Amino acid sequence: MSGKSLLLKVILLGDGGVGKSSLMNRYVTNKFDSQAFHTIGVEFLNRDLEVDGRFVTLQIWDTAGQERFKSLRTPFYRGADCCLLTFSVDDRQSFENLGNWQKEFIYYADVKDPEHFPFVVLGNKVDKEDRQVTTEEAQAWCMENGDYPYLETSAKDDTNVTVAFEEAVRQVLAVEEQLEHCMLGHTIDLNSGSKAGSSCC
């Protein structure tokens, strides 16, 4: 891959057993292990990609979903560029816990502007037949909690896995572009000492 690569840190968050490790491994190694164990603490993998002409190194952090590992995972939230809130469509409780994960991340990552932070919501395990959460319910949650993109994925059969991580990159790039636009539009007239132009920040 040629050209300067942008390093982006992405955090996978959600209850234990929703398939965060499987999503990461499917995306980076294109492998699926049905016997995978729960993550203890954190793990991360890198993958280089190109999205809309931008070269990116995606650093994907997979976190332990169990409450007893909270002290191990939360220090790694800082510096994250995007958060993938993940639940399993066949586990109602994992969906209902999304709000708690969102709040935990915002607090421990010290997010300064939660309304504009790029969250992406993933409904994983769509290969399962006994789903407990409908697409419409998940989309409604996303609209109510920040108008987040929602994607349904399956690490097992590789449904929307690449699309999900590329969407995360697009969300980060969109926020950065908006910030750059704000800074360019917010200029200072040195002669008068007053600010000229407009700001969208």
Swiss-Prot record:
Q: Which SMART domains match?
A: RAB, RAN, RAS, RHO
Per its UniProt record, what Gene3D superfamilies does this chain match?
A: P-loop containing nucleotide triphosphate hydrolases (3.40.50.300)
Instruction: Kindly list the positions annotated as binding Mg(2+).
Output: S21, T39, D62
Enzyme Commission code: 3.6.5.2
Principal location listed in the UniProt entry = membrane
- What are this entry's molecular-function GO terms? G protein activity; GDP binding; GTP binding; identical protein binding
Catalytic activity, reaction form: GTP + H2O = GDP + phosphate + H(+)
* Domain of life, per lineage: Eukaryota
Q: According to its UniProt entry, what is the function of this protein?
A: The small GTPases Rab are key regulators of intracellular membrane trafficking, from the formation of transport vesicles to their fusion with membranes. Rabs cycle between an inactive GDP-bound form and an active GTP-bound form that is able to recruit to membranes different sets of downstream effectors directly responsible for vesicle formation, movement, tethering and fusion. RAB9B is involved in the transport of proteins between the endosomes and the trans Golgi network.
Query: What is the protein name for this chain?
Result: Ras-related protein Rab-9B
- State the organism of origin: Pongo abelii (Sumatran orangutan)
Species classification = Eukaryota, Metazoa, Chordata, Craniata, Vertebrata
